[in-house]
């Protein structure tokens, strides 16, 4: 949630826990299944509780509506056959119906205008395609090969798009190198607020399953989502995107190491990604 839509944000420390344990709420929601969050939920006083709590020394659902997500988290065989999106599951846990409500996000209009002016001068009327190359050190199985990013960027440029590499501090050196090899613009890495503003200049975003997926969704951008290790039903693209996966099912379900030794992200070729992008452009 945008900070300006939250009345009070408490740090997770002893004083905050003490205050929460001695407060009364109309509704308490905890979607986190980590032990510390569930123990706190059990101690908080509320007229209605949704999500997860702590009972008999273990995580437990506050209501039966939260059981489904708890079981899919415990058992991969249940998670693999799930056909509900994350958003649908979250709403159901809170005893509500998901009606394609949009994400909430705060956009710094001044920063957005700054970057929009820069991109308008560079793109010469072409559609801007943001290429998000990173996925963080935790999820190496989501990384796409550098040479694939270069090939995709060149293909996009040749077909009349204006590609732009995007990423955080961890991807900076890589994006500089990719930019030089592909002859494609890379604006640099910035704080989150600036990154959101920069992303808003894009017409289409190409990304793996990362924070960028959520940012692009919140900004209502068209999106090509490369997915291997997750159940594709979990993602809600609001009719604005396409999910691209490997030709054969991924065996590294929710894993950070590929069981076959070679990441199935390598099986997603640049031409397939381009074709998916072109279908929603």
Task: Name every feature range the model reports, one short phrase each.
Residues 1-281:
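Catalytic machinery of carbohydrate-active enzymes
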